[in-house]
Amino acid sequence: MFIFNVLTIRCTFHVLFAICYFCDHLLQYISNSRDSKAGLKIFLVFELAVTIFNTVMLQLANRVKNGLTLAILIVSVVMFVYHQQLIVNCKKMLAL
């Protein structure tokens, strides 16, 4: 059981790293984009993905009662912070 938990936590953090890497590139693209419609389409798709991902992660955290819960909550919080940063960048882009 311990090995399963360690592997699951490692996989969770690998997913977090991949999502953060994707978020960084998405934020750069939206910041550098001149086409607000394309940026908004990307934003809406990403917002939906983040909402679904956080919902799934929080449901998983409710079912798991061990050290994995902390890893899941960390992933959810980081996704929320990136989501808020993406919202701010989209608002800046629309203001231009």
UniProtKB/Swiss-Prot annotation:
The chain crosses the membrane at residues 2-22, 38-58, 68-88. It is a multi-pass membrane protein. It is found in: Membrane. Its main location: membrane. Signal peptide: none annotated. This is Uncharacterized protein C1687.08. One of its GO terms (cellular component) is membrane. It comes from Schizosaccharomyces pombe (strain 972 / ATCC 24843) (Fission yeast).
